[in-house]
Amino acid sequence: MNTKVPIYSINGEKRGEIDLPEIFNYSVREDLIRKAFRAISLSLRQPYGSSPLAGLRRVGHTTKPGLGISRMPRIAGGSRVVGIASAVGGKSAHSPRSTKKLYVGINEKERKMAKFSAIAMTASADAVRKRGHRFSESLPLPVVVEDAVSGIKKTKDAVNLLKSIGLYEDILRSKEGKHIRAGRGKMRNRRYKVPKSLLIVGTDSVSLKVFKSLPGVDVASMDSLSIRKLAPGGVGGRLTVYTESAIEKLREANA
């Protein structure tokens, strides 16, 4: 891993160098990254369940023995069976319940180790390329830009910055990889899937929102940085751009 990386200005030119914090030398635990991603993803599920009265809204009377028919609850004056699992429109035997525990926990130490591992993998060129990202061969990772990029208001300026640094190729990869989703999701306002490209990390994600209009780009503040953004799908090594302030905040992290 590089101990020093260049700082790029708002014009994409090298403005100086910065010492990387020790967190980028953290011992990577890919198993914990997968575990943390799974726990977070499963905990975001929406509770669902059937009504407790489903299949029980008809009054059925059980017949006495000796009538030559099975003793199942039937509608009065008729032969239709109601209220049991084997009947048409009857109660489901084991229906889903909204009270089911969906939250999946993870140890606090493991969660921190997973986050530190994912951050460390953003500085590994091999891990980033293995994940499928495309960038300039001579570009040292992680990419650090000056805080002035938070003042960019036009997408055109953001594109010019990424082109001059050597990161725009990954945006094109995401744009070309956009495809129609398989399955029912295409009918439910999730028609397209777009591959993940850059992650822009700063101290304030609102000021970096101009980058969100680019295909596959996510922005995050240091407070909102999570495994879901650092390692989509539980696979670390996302191509990440940090601001100077974000690097200084990482320096304070207790790795």
UniProtKB/Swiss-Prot annotation:
Q: Which InterPro entries match?
A: Ribosomal_uL4, Ribosomal_uL4_dom_sf, Ribosomal_uL4_euk/arc_CS, Ribosomal_uL4_euk/arch, Ribosomall_uL4-arc
The record's listing under SUPFAM superfamilies reads:
Ribosomal protein L4
Name one molecular function that GO assigns to this entry: structural constituent of ribosome
Q: Name one GO biological process term.
A: translation
- Pfam families listed in its UniProt record: Ribosomal_L4
Q: Is Nucleotide-binding given among the entry's keywords? A: no
> Which keywords describe this protein according to UniProt?
Ribonucleoprotein, Ribosomal protein, RNA-binding, rRNA-binding
Going by the entry's taxonomy, the superkingdom of the source organism is recorded as Archaea
Can you list the GO cellular component terms from the UniProt entry?
ribonucleoprotein complex; ribosome
Per the entry, what this protein does is:
One of the primary rRNA binding proteins, this protein initially binds near the 5'-end of the 23S rRNA. It is important during the early stages of 50S assembly. It makes multiple contacts with different domains of the 23S rRNA in the assembled 50S subunit and ribosome.
Q: Which family does it belong to?
A: Belongs to the universal ribosomal protein uL4 family.
Q: How does it assemble?
A: Part of the 50S ribosomal subunit.
Name under which the protein is recorded: Large ribosomal subunit protein uL4
Q: Which organism is it from?
A: Thermoplasma volcanium (strain ATCC 51530 / DSM 4299 / JCM 9571 / NBRC 15438 / GSS1)
